[in-house]
Amino acid sequence: MLKLIIYQFQYSKRQWLGTIPLLFVSSLIVGTSLFGIASAIKTANINASQLFQMLIIFGGTTLFFLISNNIRLLIDIFKKDYQLWAILGASRTQLSLLVSGQFYLMAVIVSSIGTILSFIMADSYYKFLQNLLGRDELPDLVITANIQSILLSIFIVPTIVGIGAYFYSSRILKISSILKPKKKKRKVTVAGFVNISVRLFLWLLCIGSIVSAGFIRNKEIIEKQSSIVLFLLIIHILIIQSLSPSIQMFLIKFLMRIFPTENYVINTGFWNLLSNPSYLKSIQTSMSMGVTLISGFILYTQNMYSFMNTANGVLEARASFIAYMSAPIILIITSSISLTILSSNKDIEDIKQLKTLGVSRLQLFKIRIGEAIIHSVLILLVSVIFNLIILILVSLIGQFLGRSLVDISGFWQPSLIVISLLVIFYSITKGFYLFISR
């Protein structure tokens, strides 16, 4: 099996290169965290140790979830190969091992390079936090390395990626029609309904817990119950994952009906996205989850520190945001870059067909920009719905405490920043592959 994994990796290494941005940044985050923790423990700097721990905990968890989007797209790219393997007698378990083995191999190569650079990164990250919080909170720290930290840094990301790749590829291959195209999907439909029902129940439970706290009129209980908003953010992410790409496809059709146009850029962009639901789900899930997570966390922390009259509330909110959210945000953005690169490799055949039909490179580039704008509009619409719920709940908590909202910039700023980055990265990446193809 190991030889087969290596041979298959060599055969498809061009496609696997698209995963480098996500794996490289993941290895930087994990390495920075491990070197920082080891150095902080050595000098008994408890505060610094906790800050570095947050990177690996939240970064590792985010990486595990993001792997599913990359796996889904890779399986779609290698669909014909896996169908051939299935005809030759390969089982779902063997195909899952083949996918996870290649992902693990790629992750080991990239992590080895990332570990070296993360040692330098750890010192820069700590100095940045030190300037933000002050030397009283974070005294000087000398970053050191040992064999244990280096080995863990090299193999933690491949381990997370390998386990995640096996889990998600097994699940996706079971749900998809790659192995048995004519098999009915009744069990999948029932499982999906149960999945959504459980998440909806948890969502209603969170909303009910927050609203009911207002009837108690006890400040301590209200402040304690308000932390459920953070759990609600996780539920929102899971709901987005469950509803994608159905909700995005509905919105595309809805927009096409409301704003009918004869512009070839917009029309072709709409139909390109509808024809590739696998990629639509992958990039929309990542970006919508990211925007929802960032906006919700900012809205909650900035206003809650103010509600509780915390000294240096803005400073603490920024520190919390960096400690808890920096790793997930960076990973989500790099995951989107990886997904765009992977999809661009797949687009090469479509580009050749369109060129044969007489479509110029400039026209194709305009279509790609149109796709980027449509992606951005969809992300904005989905995130606004969930952000509005968080905004209303935070405002309600403020009313319970006799306060009003201090800052609502988190409702719109992250969305504009993230979708602007998406348009730029999407256009550059797609444009690059467009102009290098012959």
Residue ranges and their predicted role:
Residues 2, 6-8, 14-36, 152-167, ...:
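Alpha-helical transmembrane segments, especially those used as permease/efflux helices
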Residues 3, 174-190, 434-438:
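Short cytosolic juxtamembrane segments of multi-pass membrane proteins
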Residues 13-19, 99-117, 154, 192-203, ...:
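Selective transmembrane-helix segments that form parts of the transport pathway or gating/packing helices
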Residues 25-33, 102-126, 293, 297, ...:
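Hydrophobic alpha-helical transmembrane segments that constitute the membrane-spanning cores
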Residues 37-43, 114-149, 210-227, 300-311, ...:
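Short helix-loop junctions at transmembrane helix boundaries
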Residues 54-70, 323, 327-334:
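Long, hydrophobic alpha-helical segments
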Residues 65-104, 334-373:
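Interfacial "coupling" helices/loops that link adjacent transmembrane helices in transporter permeases
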Residues 69-76, 119, 123, 127, ...:
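Short helix-terminus and kink motifs of transmembrane alpha helices
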